[in-house]
Amino acid sequence: MAYPILVSLLMEQMIVLTDTAFMGRVGEVELGAAAIAGVFYMVIFMAGHGFCVGTQILIARRNGERRYGEVGQVFYQGLYFLMALAAVLFVACQMYADEILSMMISSPNILAKAEDYIHWRVYGFFFAFAGGMFRSFYVGTTQTKTLTLNSIVMVLSNVAFNYVLVFGKCGLPALGIAGAAIGSSLAEFVSLLFFIGYTRAKIDCRHFGLSRFPALDIKRQRSILSVSMWVMVQSFVSLSTWFIFFVYIEHLGEESLAIANLARNISGLPFMMVIAFASAASSIVSNMIGAGQTDKVALAIRRHIWLAYLCVTPLLLVVAAFPQMFIRIYTDIPQLVDAAVPTVWVMCSAYTVLVPANVLFSSVSGTGDTRMAFWLEMAALVFYMIYNTWVVYIMRVDVMWAWTAEIVYGSLMFAFCGAYMRRGSWRRRSI
């Protein structure tokens, strides 16, 4: 089950990697601005993504219980909520994003480029949120092969749109960083069209209750929110600390921010591998509990952790051995290539703890106890932010040492989530 999710997530990560690769050819300022604006967008986006994770847990549970007709109810009620949320977030970003960024970014050049990116990128909320609900459906019902096809379509669209809009091809003006934002939003629109067409053509919509649009059901909305709310808040807060981390690094200088963005994008491939196994573990845990197979949960989690290690470790060893080869994918600026090497090494070492931490954390959410998952991560993030504030903002260390914050975070999440799963109170929870 993890393989199609992995391919899907890797292809989605290619959206970010494509933007970075194009910006690395435009300039150092654009490369840094794409990093901080991209993370800012992701902070807002994660509210919707968190809701999708909550609906995925519910869809998986109903699928495991063989209550297939209720899957469509969860899907459509979730879709209604997400479209309303997308509208609210779109308006809020158009009104306040520039002001928020200006309070946090010290470089006028980076600020101007970041504002250009965000102005166009927020149009993607509507397409990305709707597409997220389709992913929740396919993962929750264990029909994950569809995600691979969809992601290939999205990535190819993004590459084409970026090439045309960033550099000004086919008679269009060169839009630079704004072109990357427009291209990403258009790629998400193409992805959504694919999901709609594929679902209508290949899925038994009547079996899953997808053949008709139900009326708005406030009671069911509350039921979904009772699970999703904690994931939404957790996702938003988690990415907010990541955004603050990049703001801290931006104050170290434009080069430091560019290096951090390079490390983030090189980390994207192994991170998506880990998240694929974590997402699969969450869905399988929820399905097992729904089917009354709680005694098999621990073994399933251990298997996903070791499989994640087996997939990620060879790649990380290659990256650590040939860091400059991977850095040059995203930039051809010589001083950045050399300066980013130590940071890439630290990033690779962090996966020793990030692999089990992410699988265990997703498994906690898969039990349905999303409130506990929220508090476990909040506890880890408190220490993470204390460490970041002291090491990066106050001590102003090199960006290489700043990246050790990931080791601190991963170690704490591994310890907290592992202790919760061993305790076993999740066996008695129903949703």
PLM region descriptions:
Residues 10, 14-32, 101-108, 164-175, ...:
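Helix-terminus/linker motif at the lipid-water interface of multi-pass membrane proteins
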Residues 15-16, 22, 59, 138, ...:
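Hydrophobic side chains within alpha-helical segments
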Residues 31-94, 128-142, 146-147, 259-323, ...:
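Small-residue-rich hydrophobic transmembrane alpha-helices
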